[in-house]
């Protein structure tokens, strides 16, 4: 990249990050853990076995982009209930990364983090 095309990080007003499998490595398997936990939630909420729950979960995800959305539309799920049950997960697989945290903290400007999970989940992951 030529010198004239370079942008100083001081010129960036807003930084946007995706939390899931981006600010922590995919090798943590956190999304796989969430997927399994969600299957248990779907089974319990709908009163079906895990295999049926897995099919419902994947069907809703494919159709709506989020299993939660399908559960809200078809099964009357209150999202607050979903997030309450889905948030208390074991985050020990997410290794602390103080260097990344320090690098992000040094960036000037506003920082936005996106996730499909709850704000509480994001806070817990970011504290790691």
Describe each region flagged by the PLM.
Residues 4-17, 22-99, 109, 119-123:
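N-terminal helical cap/lid subdomain that shapes the substrate entry/recognition surface
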Residues 126:
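ABC transporter ATPase nucleotide-binding domain signature
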Residues 1:
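Non-catalytic, low-structured ubiquitin/UBL-interacting segments
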Residues 115-117:
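Conserved phosphate-coupling serine/threonine residues in phosphotransfer and NTP-handling enzymes
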């Amino acid at each position: 990249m030529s010198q004239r095309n370079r942008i100083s990080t001081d010129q960036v007003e807003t930084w946007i990050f995706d939390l899931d499998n981006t600010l922590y490595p995919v090798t943590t398997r956190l999304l796989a853990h969430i997927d399994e936990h969600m299957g248990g939630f779907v089974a319990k909420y709908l009163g079906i076995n895990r295999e049926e729950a897995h099919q419902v979960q994947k069907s809703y995800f494919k159709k709506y982009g989020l299993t939660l959305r399908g559960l809200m539309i078809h099964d009357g799920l209150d999202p607050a209930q979903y997030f309450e049950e889905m948030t208390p997960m074991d985050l020990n697989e997410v290794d602390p990364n103080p260097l990344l945290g320090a690098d992000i903290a040094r960036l000037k400007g506003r920082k936005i983090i996106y996730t499909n999970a709850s704000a509480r989940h994001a806070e817990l992951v970011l504290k790691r």
